[in-house]
């Protein structure tokens, strides 16, 4: 996979604090992409990629909105350079979507009956002892 060209502009102040974590997550992403998929179902081979993408986006979201540890300029830089998913962050800011695992789970066009994914069903409404896994990303329940 070719390296993505980043902007020529130097990153804002504070980048050196979050860069090691983002580099580590990028390395995990590369490992997940090259991981062999023998013995797994077709959909299971993408689950680690979705988890790492969620983890990287959640890291930047928490730094900016929860802990207020990075500046708006650095946050915008991370969004612009593709380190975080701005659409997923936009959903996390809405009530009821604070723990959303991925955007595919709320897209109704991907299902036969125009409904959300099984992981969006509250655990109180599911059968007791029933273990569910989302077919899109492997989530075990992100609605609460």
From Swiss-Prot:
Chief localisation class: nucleus
Keywords associated with the record: Developmental protein, mRNA processing, mRNA splicing, Nucleus, Spliceosome
InterPro entries the UniProt entry points to: BUD31, BUD31/G10-rel_CS
Domain of life: Eukaryota
Pfam family, one: BUD31
Record flagged with keyword Nucleus: yes
Motif (Nuclear localization signal) on chain: 2-10
UniProt subcellular location: Nucleus
Family: Belongs to the BUD31 (G10) family.
Protein function: Involved in pre-mRNA splicing process.
Protein name: Protein BUD31 homolog
Taxonomic source organism: Xenopus laevis
